[in-house]
Amino acid sequence: MSAVNTPAGFSDFKVADISLADWGRKEVIIAESEMPALMGLRRKYQAEQPLKGAKIIGCIHMTIQTAVLIETLVALGAEVRWSSCNIFSTQDQAAAAIAAAGIPVFAWKGETEQEYEWCIEQTILKDGQPWDANMVLDDGGDLTEILHKKYPAMLEKIHGVTEETTTGVHRLLDMLAKGELKVPAINVNDSVTKSKNDNKYGCRHSLNDAIKRGTDHLLSGKQALVIGYGDVGKGSAQSLRQEGMIVKVTEVDPICAMQACMDGFEVVSPFKDGINTGTEAGINKDLLGRIDLIVTTTGNVNVCDANMLKALKKRAVVCNIGHFDNEIDTAFMRKHWAWEEVKPQVHKIHRTGAGTFDPQNDDYLILLAEGRLVNLGNATGHPSRIMDGSFANQVLAQIFLFEQKFAELPAAKKAERLTVEVLPKKLDEEVALEMVRGFGGVVTQLTPQQAEYIGVTVEGPFKPDAYRY
């Protein structure tokens, strides 16, 4: 048994192994040195305690970097209760370190779907009763949806939601359009210092790492198909290209497709003439029969469907770095094909039928992380320096919404404030400046004459909201 001690009498947590806390703490200390923006905000605002009185329910990947985020929120005055937004993404040593610090956390790597939902419930409840939470920090929207559907009374005290991902933002906007969203939300995903860092540069770093850890394959000289060319797709295509892969891209958006062409990628379709007829006859079998690796990056459903999976080259690697496991039709694979676990989060999917299989069969696909996020299932996700920008945005977004005190507004004012919006650009620039300083960079200041000439202040913001970085 470990010598690790939690605060006396503290048992408000469930992790895989509390004895991993010392290891986790060592990694947290290293991560802090690689997160200058987040730590800069901690130093800047700690005396002010801008989150004093905030009670935050958090549901985001329980990694080492998230531990730094959690402890920053606490340092600024908040109370938190935490779970992971993915059954495979928790780093158990990180969860243990947070529990050992006396912070309620419910997360471990390899949760079942039922355990995943149970963990979220434990953050919503305290001592079996709904916690008097007033803020939500979410990744993907599951926590937000559960609160709206099962605990609507809690929303009367909640000032708002800060959402990390494209998928979660889509769900928020859908709820807003249908009149179902009851609290305002900050779209952290579309802050420049999140979308460009996390979605693009983070995936560039972590996709190839995860594939190599999962398969031990040499990637160079092989053919890859990247589904989607948004920021995640751009980073993913670069990640595979720098490994020496021959990368093709498929897109539905002509602007993103044009960008892929300009970046030197061949834009193709897995469907004849680009039209998904829903039949095997409509599949571009010549293309898919040559693909060694396929990765989904879209946040959309069934972008790698059953007919595509049937047509893929034998022994092709299939993975997802978008968000949920429904980007790949894993439901079809579970129903019709046999699964053989090679090691945790690596399966051979035998296309010879369900039930028993011949271990020597060579007609299989290699599925990573069961179709969930490959970079967190098969590796440790984005590095600390990447997550620095994302999580600094989360802190500023939490402060921003908490100060607005939505739950205390009269009904008429609430109707005006019920929006899904991005952080003000000035705050985005604040995060970027701290990141540049962390790299040892020096930003040049405009002269008053230059600022007047382009119609901005010397302190910024420097670009209009519509500017595309």
Curated annotation (Swiss-Prot):
Binding-site residues for NAD(+), renumbered to this chain: 165-167, 199, 228-233, 251, 300, 321-323, 375
One GO term of the biological process aspect: L-homocysteine biosynthetic process
Cofactor(s) this protein requires: NAD(+)
Annotated compartments: Cytoplasm
UniProt keywords, alphabetically: Cytoplasm, Hydrolase, NAD, One-carbon metabolism
Positions of transmembrane segments: none
Pathway terms, separated by semicolons: Amino-acid biosynthesis; L-homocysteine biosynthesis; L-homocysteine from S-adenosyl-L-homocysteine: step 1/1
Annotated PROSITE patterns: ADOHCYASE_1, ADOHCYASE_2
Cofactor annotation comment: Binds 1 NAD(+) per subunit.
Enzyme class: hydrolase
Top-rank taxon: Bacteria
Keyword Cytoplasm part of the UniProt annotation: yes
Molecular functions (GO terms): adenosylhomocysteinase activity
SUPFAM superfamilies: Formate/glycerate dehydrogenase catalytic domain-like, NAD(P)-binding Rossmann-fold domains
Entry's EC annotation: 3.13.2.1
GO CC terms: cytosol
Entry binding sites for substrate: 63, 139, 164, 194, 198
Pfam families for this protein: AdoHcyase (PF05221), AdoHcyase_NAD (PF00670)
Role summary: May play a key role in the regulation of the intracellular concentration of adenosylhomocysteine.
Protein family per UniProt: Belongs to the adenosylhomocysteinase family.
PANTHER family (UniProt xref): ADENOSYLHOMOCYSTEINASE
Official protein name in the record: Adenosylhomocysteinase
Species of provenance: Pseudomonas entomophila (strain L48)
Higher taxonomy: Bacteria, Pseudomonadati, Pseudomonadota, Gammaproteobacteria, Pseudomonadales
